[in-house]
Curated annotation (Swiss-Prot):
GO terms for biological process: translation. GO terms for cellular component: cytosol; ribonucleoprotein complex; ribosome. This is Small ribosomal subunit protein eS17. GO terms for molecular function: structural constituent of ribosome. InterPro entries: Ribosomal_eS17, Ribosomal_eS17_CS, Ribosomal_eS17_sf. The keyword Ribosomal protein applies. PANTHER family: 40S RIBOSOMAL PROTEIN S17. Keywords: Ribonucleoprotein, Ribosomal protein.
Length: 71
């Protein structure tokens, strides 16, 4: 089982995704670079957790859109 992400990571990721939806993809590496450019996060660990959570959110959105199109 995975670990639950802290609230500040989730809220920051959601704010970034809402403000810049076209900057993020399903690629963690690209999202990591985008988070580094868009947010002032001094910690590498926190930056990676935010990028990882954004990657999960983007994948969920795409899967949801695909399921809606198939239905």
């Amino acid at each position: 089982m995975g670990r639950v992400k802290p609230k500040f990571i989730k809220s920051l990721a959601e704010k970034l995704l809402e403000a810049y939806p076209d900057r993020f993809t399903e690629s963690f590496k690209e999202n990591k670079k985008a988070v580094a450019e868009l947010a002032d996060i001094p910690s590498k660990t926190v930056r990676n957790k935010v990028a990882g959570y954004i990657t999960r959110l983007v994948k969920r959105q795409k899967a949801k859109e695909k399921a809606e199109q198939a239905a």
